[in-house]
Every structure is written in C-alpha cells, then in structure tokens.
Curated annotation (Swiss-Prot):
Alphabetical list of Pfam families matching this protein: YfbU
Domain of life: Bacteria
Signal peptide region: none
Alphabetized InterPro entries for the sequence: UPF0304_YfbU, YfbU_alpha-helical_sf, YfbU_helix-hairpin_sf
Protein name: UPF0304 protein KPK_1463
Family classification: Belongs to the UPF0304 family.
Taxonomic placement: Bacteria, Pseudomonadati, Pseudomonadota, Gammaproteobacteria, Enterobacterales
UniProt organism field: Klebsiella pneumoniae (strain 342)
Length: 164
C-alpha cells in the first residue's frame, strides 16, 4: 500500500484516537500506528487486507451463493422424502478464513450487520468453512442456474447441485 507522508500522518492520528475510543483494542491500534508511522512495508501489507475491496460483481456472486443455499434448504424442507440427503449438505458452510477472508467478511457483514439470511447457522466457526469453497460454489451455481425451478428443486436436482 503506497501512502504519502500526509496520508500516513492522518492514519496514524486516526489510530491514536481509536486507541482512546476503544480501549479493549488499544494494543492493536498502537501496533498499527507504529507500523504506519515508521513505514514498515511488510506489515503495511496487512492494511491491504483490512482496506481491501470486493467488486460489485463479486458481492453479487456471494449473495447468489447464499441465495442458492437458501433455495436448497427450502427445497429440501419441502421434499416429501428427503431420505438420502443429509441436512448438512444443504447448509451453507461459508468460506475459508485463511484463503477467502474477504468473502467470509462479506458473508458476516450480510448476516450480522445487514440482517440478511439471518436464518443461516453460523455454527461454532462463524461461517469459516476451514477449507476453500469458492470453486466448489461456482460449480454448484452453474448447475443451480440451469434448473428451471430454482426454488422448488427435486431431490435429483438437489443431489446434482451439492455433488457438482
């Protein structure tokens, strides 16, 4: 992250204020303030992760993934015979915190701040699937989009989607 000296000074002052406003996280803010003031390039890359962005297209894809899981769960619930399909297979797991942190952060924002998909169970890991999921979800979306009745899926269609 490239910053002018003026930008670094402003950000350093912001971290100094946050230290006073949020004493519970004061150590974290003091650390970030030191990194900014001294211009430690390696550690400044951490800010790239904090201040990164998701494109509108990526946000819409994440919402589409969540919507697919909503449709899967509703369809599974409405099946007369759901035998052979474990409920865990139609439950949204989230994204991997280690490799897909931006997607995970957006999911948490959508559920916890925006109040959407509040019926999703965050589990004990807060939507951290602990394994990369993006490519799997892309394959699943392709199959789901090909289904004629996306919110009234048959058991065969559900199986095709979750096994994609």
């Amino acid at each position: 992250m490239e910053m002018t000296n003026a930008q670094r000074l402003i950000l350093s002052n912001q971290y100094k204020m946050m230290t006073m406003l949020d004493p519970d996280n004061a150590e974290r803010y003091r650390r970030l303030q030191t990194i900014i003031e001294r211009g430690y390039g390696l550690q400044m890359r951490e800010l790239d992760r904090e201040f990164g962005q998701l494109t509108e297209e990526t946000c819409r894809t994440v919402i589409d993934i969540m919507e697919m899981y909503h449709a899967l769960h509703v369809s599974w619930t409405n099946l007369k015979d759901a035998a052979g399909i474990d409920e865990r297979r139609v439950t949204f797991l989230g994204f991997d915190a280690a490799t897909e942190a931006r997607f995970l952060g957006y999911v948490r924002f959508m559920v916890n701040i925006e109040g959407r998909y509040s019926h999703f169970d965050a589990g004990t890991h807060g939507f951290n699937s602990q394994t990369p999921m993006w490519e799997k979800y892309q394959r699943m979306l392709s199959v789901w989009h090909a289904c004629p009745r996306q919110y009234h899926l048959s058991s065969n269609e559900i199986n095709q989607i979750i096994n994609a």
